[in-house]
A protein has these predicted regions:
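Conserved SAM-binding loop and adjacent beta-strand
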Residues: 8-25
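Glycine-rich SAM-binding Motif I of class I
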Residues: 47-51
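Class I SAM-dependent methyltransferase SAM/SAH-binding core
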Residues: 52-96
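A short acidic, Gly/Pro-enriched loop at the edge of an enzyme's catalytic core
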Residues: 98-107
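A short SAM/SAH-binding and catalytic strip from SAM-dependent methyltransferases
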Residues: 106-121
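A short glycine-rich, Lys/Arg-flanked "PGG" loop and its adjoining helix->strand segment in the class I
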Residues: 124-139
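Short, glycine-/aromatic-enriched active-site segment of Class I SAM-dependent methyltransferases
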Residues: 142-162
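Conserved Class I S-adenosyl-L-methionine
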Residues: 186-248
Length: 248
């Protein structure tokens, strides 16, 4: 199986975005989850967040991951941690998994691509679709990029290749339009961004140094360069927001 940038860059990250685990835990705490509560982690990567939530809040986590390499990695880490009885890894899309299972007390989608279904990107429509799979009083923990100001057209085109982004305020407006209460809305600080970027860039550099002749090395290096340029150029325009929305 081919090696991709995210297979390497995400391995050492606690949270695969510009967000600290401490801030994430504080946001989850506001959801008021009871022991044994059903939680979905959309795009769980290697399972680090799922494991932290299972330990810290004694919840039952359905960890969904479409990428087979990361899903296998998540299963291995969860088994090694002795948490297989509290975390179930589902390989596939979150939309299909949500349809197949009962409602959740918390759905967590942090930097997820089309979590409510392929082609559905309008924020209010995404939130409305996800809220259908929440219990009454359940919460959606949403984390994603936002535009701090209108970006140059080439930057928007590059960044929105895999998603659709709005302003910090517009994410919250979309949640209200979907019938959700905004419980909290925070913005990641520069230290969180620095940690996110440094960990990824170090992991990629180390892998390339160790595998200079790997067939996928040129593609990994090119992707790393593209992402670095995007984040460098986008720094004045891009923020990362994390929100807790509650269903009435």
């Amino acid at each position: 199986m081919r090696v991709a940038f995210h297979h390497i860059a995400y391995q050492p990250l606690a949270v695969c975005n510009a967000l600290s685990m401490a801030r994430l835990e504080a946001t989850v705490r506001r959801a008021g989850l009871k022991p044994g509560a059903p939680v979905m982690d959309v795009g769980c990567a290697y399972g680090e967040v799922s494991m932290r939530l299972a330990r810290a809040f004694d919840v039952r986590v359905t960890a969904v991951e479409l990428d087979p390499v990361m899903a296998e990695g998540a299963e291995a880490r969860i088994t090694a941690a002795g948490l297989s009885d509290r975390i179930s890894v589902r390989r596939g899309t979150s939309a299909a998994t949500l349809t197949a299972l009962p409602p959740f007390d918390l759905i967590m989608a942090i930097g997820s691509t089309e979590p409510a279904g392929k082609g559905l990107r309008d924020p209010a429509a995404v939130f409305a679709a996800l809220s259908q799979h929440l219990t009454s009083g359940g919460a959606l923990l949403w984390g994603d990029l936002f535009w701090k100001e209108e970006p140059p057209a080439p930057l928007r085109q590059l960044v929105e290749t895999g998603g659709y982004y709005v302003s910090h305020e517009a994410w919250q407006t979309a949640a209200r339009d979907a019938g959700l209460e905004v419980v909290s809305a925070e913005i990641s600080d520069e230290a969180e961004w620095a940690t996110y970027r440094t960990v990824m860039e170090t992991a990629i550099a180390d892998w390339l140094d160790a595998h200079p002749d790997h067939a996928d090395a040129p593609t990994v290096a090119a992707t790393a360069h593209r992402i670095k340029m995007m984040l460098d150029f986008g720094a004045p325009y891009l923020g990362f927001g994390h929100y807790l929305f509650r269903k009435g």
